[in-house]
């Protein structure tokens, strides 16, 4: 009985959501993991790209947690994740083929609960100065973004575009025109992607138009055909997001559990920029206005 209680206590300590940073070859990238105590223990992991995937074969041994890295396709010898709980931090590694190692550190994800409703500030036109208020995510990458007829245009696959300003809580209006089979995204605080995609006539899904990629599924999907302008009105307060697409509320004050693939970092408690995804296909944006909380 004592052993069972100790195990339950340790599982509870490890349980929860963790904002992770992986370091490999001097480069860092964000990850996120959600650990469910069980029994049996389970969870989900968000790697640097793609969407959050379920964990299997989770083993908790004292203050340690171990599991094979999840993948969408079967892998004969998956990399192994191991980390130890030290206070409110996780420290560990991902060990891959050939004994390659990626260092992982993490902290418990903040609740981001707001005690009082925000007081909204002055609206900001994010295109008022053209493209001057934006910067490429990768300064050395191919930058296909330009201003044309008051629109922010991406002509093809290249780097993402990021606002120079950062925001905490805000209301964002943004209009988008997606071509046939087009794919882009609107990253809130640079960490949580609202999917932008040619999904006319498709059912709602967390990886379809308006979904929080791999995290939150819309209630409906009033997407318009490719080539037509569509309007988003997004309110983001703490972890809570409301998404209105073409006048219909498709996500209503839903919690975003954690970062999505392609996030700039995993520091969820900090302000972050608006990032527009440009590494997939051509896309056009216009009328981008944000009202930050004071």
Residue ranges and their predicted role:
Residues 1-10:
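Sec-dependent N-terminal signal peptides
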Residues 13-37, 44-294:
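Carbohydrate-interacting regions of secretory-pathway proteins
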